[in-house]
Amino acid sequence: MRGLPNFYHSYTFFFFFLLILFPAYSISANTLSASESLTISSNNTIVSPGNVFELGFFKPGLDSRWYLGIWYKAISKRTYVWVANRDTPLSSSIGTLKISDSNLVVLDQSDTPVWSTNLTGGDVRSPLVAELLDNGNFVLRDSKNSAPDGVLWQSFDFPTDTLLPEMKLGWDAKTGFNRFIRSWKSPDDPSSGDFSFKLETEGFPEIFLWNRESRMYRSGPWNGIRFSGVPEMQPFEYMVFNFTTSKEEVTYSFRITKSDVYSRLSISSSGLLQRFTWIETAQNWNQFWYAPKDQCDEYKECGVYGYCDSNTSPVCNCIKGFKPRNPQVWGLRDGSDGCVRKTLLSCGGGDGFVRLKKMKLPDTTTASVDRGIGVKECEQKCLRDCNCTAFANTDIRGSGSGCVTWTGELFDIRNYAKGGQDLYVRLAATDLEDKRNRSAKIIGSSIGVSVLLLLSFIIFFLWKRKQKRSILIETPIVDHQLRSRDLLMNEVVISSRRHISRENNTDDLELPLMEFEEVAMATNNFSNANKLGQGGFGIVYKGKLLDGQEMAVKRLSKTSVQGTDEFKNEVKLIARLQHINLVRLLACCVDAGEKMLIYEYLENLSLDSHLFDKSRNSKLNWQMRFDIINGIARGLLYLHQDSRFRIIHRDLKASNILLDKYMTPKISDFGMARIFGRDETEANTRKVVGTYGYMSPEYAMDGIFSMKSDVFSFGVLLLEIISSKRNKGFYNSDRDLNLLGCVWRNWKEGKGLEIIDPIITDSSSTFRQHEILRCIQIGLLCVQERAEDRPTMSLVILMLGSESTTIPQPKAPGYCLERSLLDTDSSSSKQRDDESWTVNQITVSVLDAR
């Protein structure tokens, strides 16, 4: 027994030795006391009780700057949800978090505070403690009071780019905070970016997505179930949404009812609002929802008194009783000028309301709310106010309750196929549907004659309407000229009028038809001074109408490889498509033996004119290129997934990407595009069309094309944007490889950055090495030889926009060393077993290269 004290003495000494040797374990699991500190060098962290979240220092990507932040510990992919010193990073690996003078502070190498909770005043008697809670909230509180009233400061009051469950977005009267989320500057730069998501408390509260000082997207007000502008926001088994409006707070939040489900709402550095859920089996974040989704989500897309409907073409429509403010511009598919009343209101003169169903309510920042009355009382209230222009229920649950009224103009309205709610817009008596019924009552004793006249009017009206819908402008048949009816196969209704009537069925489409003389005048008789470019199809000219409207005229040459079929195809497809990243077709011309397409004029012409011109590509810094990549990806996703049709472009290349004055990319040239059914995944053709260097192997060799063919072309384009080198015609003096081969070789050798355009590295303010390497990796994934290995465009966008998304390692690309075109009459070829064929060594029945 005499040796027992010596054993305990030795054990105690060993225990204290371990504490000295491993200081990382000197801090409690989820708290930091006033006597403790967190340092970068010790690699200490604080972990929430349920091991879901972790707080510590980190540096993103390959940067040398350090930040204090919170991330998910329970999942395999490092995902940051909060950053303390996002705009004041530590410049070296020396940094400390501690409690000092009743504040949490982050100190740099000289013990100078770079971040603090900035609490002032108050009588703090007991010691303070910092604690990381189970929900990811980092709090500073009284060490003797763990109740909510003991909290002096919390990270949930200062969000960065992520809204977590139980975190509140919006205004709190007690603290005076209006909490909002703001994007990172880039995927590997946590500093404050350009985009923010804020709750507007004025009028009928709603949330806006901002790009600096400009509104981009609006959620619509909360209608008791969901936001008016988010119809897909349905109740879920494990997710509960909450919107609170009271004197104490106006906030939005959500909570998760299952502890093993992780979800977050975040805003990407490119301005995309996204909800993610963690998929354990895939070990990845799944994009559950995102906004803006389409052109109709763009703020004020159709101006005042106009509404947007993605299922009509054009997407902009005037509310019943209104007409386009500028018919000519409206006819050219620019709805920003909005609409005006056909008949002015007459207060007390029989005004009424037209009921619009399944609508996103107009902007409500200046609207008035009365939650104590119903829809009938709301209607009377609006009628009594001569300035009232519309009303709706504030709560759509049950039979509806509450009242919101608008005075002044109505804007940012859209119609949904499902969801939305009823909106009642005030009209003059003469514009109401039941005007004929009221007239019949006034006639009284002459009802018989009135009915006869009324029936005659209806018959005449219907006859005129039928005539209007069936009219097609037919041009004389001169030589090989085709009638416009035959040309467009009755799928596009051609109108000679600039104003497009909205009386036609939404399945039809009216496209303005311009006369040859009008186009010739607009282009100064197709002068060389107006020439913008030239291709296998013909020449593109700049034109200007008498009202100053600029346009681009694509004039097909008589010998164009883009023949009548391609012309019809382009008109049918692009006339029905509406997206910010697709070029807009304004009109067409089939006259005097000519075929011409009239597009919106884009000031910065095509991407290739900037990318491959050394005198012009100097302004293409990395941020601009990254935005162009994202825009092209969104446009392609719209074609593949989000449009009314599933469309394969088949000719995606740099010269078919046009740039507007803001350098927003727009996909053009749909002459080779094909429509797929929703259940179709691929098709086969004996006529291979497209451009060498952009065609996928399976398409070039076997005529098989699918969405993955476009993905391949996108991958080539992405790598061209990064390198400013063409895939076709690329030459490397050391090895006879095309661009894809060069990128692949450098990637395997760990020299991925060597292919970057030096212009990018010179613009140090926007050069983000880690982000560029991710893009190169994504590009290589897109150009993999086997179509099934390539990602979908939805996954591409997810990988581009989310730093937390895992990117797999790419396999070898499908690329070529030389071109060998064989007899075009042959449909197959033989090769020896020892021959190594490449993508461009192909045999096809008919080959059209442009």
From Swiss-Prot:
Substituting residue 34 to T results in: In strain: cv. Bor-1, cv. Pu2-23, cv. Pu2-7, cv. Wa-1, cv. Wassilewskija
- Please give the tissue specificity annotation from the record for this chain: Expressed in the root-hypocotyl transition zone, at the base of lateral roots, axillary buds and pedicels.
Membrane-topology descriptor: Single-pass type I membrane protein
Induction details: By wounding and Xanthomonas campestris pv. campestris.
A GO term from the CC aspect? plasmodesma
User: Which reactions appear under catalytic activity for this entry?
Assistant: L-seryl-[protein] + ATP = O-phospho-L-seryl-[protein] + ADP + H(+); L-threonyl-[protein] + ATP = O-phospho-L-threonyl-[protein] + ADP + H(+)
Q: What is the effect of changing residue 240 to I?
A: In strain: cv. Ler-1, cv. Lp2-2, cv. Lp2-6, cv. Tamm-2, cv. Tamm-27
Q: Which GO terms describe its molecular function?
A: ATP binding; carbohydrate binding; protein serine kinase activity; transmembrane receptor protein serine/threonine kinase activity; ubiquitin protein ligase binding
Sites carrying a glycan are 43, 118, 242, 387, 437
Cytoplasmic domain ranges by topology? 463-850
The name under which this protein is listed is Receptor-like serine/threonine-protein kinase SD1-8
Which species?
Arabidopsis thaliana
Gene for this chain: SD18
